[in-house]
C-alpha cells in the first residue's frame, strides 16, 4: 500500500499554480503526515511534481569521459511524522522544467518509461536514479530560433524521507 500523487502544473520557486489559485508544495504534504492521517502512518507517500521551480537555465557542461542502520527490534516503535515521504521534483530549485509540446515533460516521459520497464527487484530510489540519468543525458532543448533557450539541460531533484525500501 502507498499513496502516489502526481502534480503537473506551472510553478516557480516554492510555489505551484492551479487554475484559480497558487499554493506551496508543502500544502500538498501537510494533510498526509502521520499525525494528521493515521491511516497512512508507516505507508509510503510519493509525490511527483512536474513544474518549473524558477527561470534559471542549465546549459550543462561537456565531459571528456563518463565516468541501513542497525537498531534494536521491538514490537512497537515510534516514527517521525514526516517519515515515509518521497518528493520528486522535475527540476532543481530555481530552475526551468522542460517539456516537449508533443511528447510532454522530460521528467514524466522518463518516469513513465522507467516505471514501465523496472524489474520487480528495483526499489523506487534506484528507479528514480535512472529517471534522473535519463533526463540529464537523453534530453536537451532544441530551440535554435531562441539561442538562450537552445541546448539547455535539466536534472530532477529527489527528496526522500523513506525509511524502508519500496518496490512495486
State where each predicted segment sits.
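Cysteine endopeptidase catalytic domains of the caspase/legumain-like
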Residues: 1-168
Amino acid at each position: 500500500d502507498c499513496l502516489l500523487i502526481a502534480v503537473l502544473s506551472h510553478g516557480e520557486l516554492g510555489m505551484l499554480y492551479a487554475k484559480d489559485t497558487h499554493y506551496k508544495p508543502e500544502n500538498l504534504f501537510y494533510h498526509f503526515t502521520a499525525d494528521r492521517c493515521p491511516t497512512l502512518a508507516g505507508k509510503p507517500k510519493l509525490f511527483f511534481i512536474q513544474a518549473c521551480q524558477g527561470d534559471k537555465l542549465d546549459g550543462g557542461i561537456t565531459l571528456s569521459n563518463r565516468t541501513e542502520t542497525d537498531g534494536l527490534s521491538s514490537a512497537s516503535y515510534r516514527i517521525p511524522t514526516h517519515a515515509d515521504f518521497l518528493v520528486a521534483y522535475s527540476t532543481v530549485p530555481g530552475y526551468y522544467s522542460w517539456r516537449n509540446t508533443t511528447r510532454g515533460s522530460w521528467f514524466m516521459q522518463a518516469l513513465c518509461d522507467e516505471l514501465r520497464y523496472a524489474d520487480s527487484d528495483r526499489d523506487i530510489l534506484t528507479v528514480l536514479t535512472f529517471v534522473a540519468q535519463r533526463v540529464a543525458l537523453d534530453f536537451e532543448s532544441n530551440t535554435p530560433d531562441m539561442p538562450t533557450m537552445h541546448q539547455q539541460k535539466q536534472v530532477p531533484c529527489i527528496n526522500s524521507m523513506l525509511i524502508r525500501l519500496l518496490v512495486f
